[in-house]
UniProtKB/Swiss-Prot annotation:
Record-level GO cellular component terms: cell outer membrane; pore complex
Periplasmic-side positions: 19-29, 64-79, 124-131, 155-157, 185-387
Organism: Neisseria meningitidis serogroup A / serotype 4A (strain DSM 15465 / Z2491)
Name the UniProt record assigns to this protein: Capsule polysaccharide export outer membrane protein CtrA
Domain of life per record: Bacteria
Record lipid sites (N-palmitoyl cysteine): C19
Gene: ctrA
Biological processes annotated in GO: monoatomic ion transport
Amino acid sequence: MLKLKFCIVISFLILGSACSAIPSSGPSAKKVVSLGQQSEAQIPEVELIDVNHAVAQSLYKAQVNQSFTQFGDGYASTGTLNIGDVLDIMIWEAPPAVLFGGGLSSMGSGSAQQTKLPEQLVTARGTVSVPFVGDISVVGKTPGQVQEIIKGRLKKMANQPQVMVRLVQNNAANVSVIRAGNSVRMPLTAAGERVLDAVAAVGGSTANVQDTNVQLTRGNVVRTVALEDLVANPRQNILLRRGDVVTMITNPYTFTSMGAVGRTQEIGFSARGLSLSEAIGRMGGLQDRRSDARGVFVFRYTPLVELPAERQDKWIAQGYGSEAEIPTVYRVNMADAHSLFSMQRFPVKNKDVLYVSNAPLAEVQKFLSFVFSPVTSGANSINNLTN
């Protein structure tokens, strides 16, 4: 009888503190959901969104919209000259040479006198200067058209002049290609350079193809596509335009798994993307004895413009700008069979946190184990001492 009373006293002492002392790998599903139900005085606020087919499809479409085909095609260079281009001008004059008999860079070429002018930079006014001819407007003209203009003006002064004009440095129609350790300005030619030509111009990627993104900036619009998709889909390999910026990004993507899963870890995935169902598979799935299938959450910062319109209005009314990133929790109920379809469309993003809460019954079992294990151990010790 004395032993029983002693055990009961110990049980109640432990019970008083056990609720807050039970170890846990994270918050319960109820606590996570309460984040989206805070009063206005509680900051920062959190957007809580239940994942269904409509939500997953909206996020999937936003990801698919990252496509170079939206830019429309570029165009092959027409070979016309523009401000900043550098020209090489050669002039031949039949004997007897009247204008170019000597000086500058002259040499005999058979019976004709050849003169090479210093390289000519197309000025901000769009002109180049030629001796005895003066300033010539060249912007929008091809080298062939420019040489005919020079030849025509020299005919009245030189003896049977012949002219050749070459574009030696294309500074006006080019594309900037940026990669870690190697960046170039690639001139556009009449051949029509494409995105993969820009990738090749810097020697390709320094990382694995699956870990590389290609970002194209045209004006104020930026789109990013996985290099793997760019190679596999010729429609993405569009013609480039003057002023485009092609950037190669080689940082691999990662997400973090936490809670009632195999183990807490950071998991990498390719730039091509990953669905939520694939992510859960990579982290070893949910633990049968611990996890709450109704408490699967994705934590991320979501750009305001990606939220549903009615939710955007709520945040804008609170003073958030269009560039703001909103702390967002997406809740998935894996106990609902329909969620298995939604998860195949729900895209995981870089730096996401996937958290699986403990099931309520698992918490009860943990509590009972926490309470009665020391009591049982204590009772056994008393029995041993009594004996």
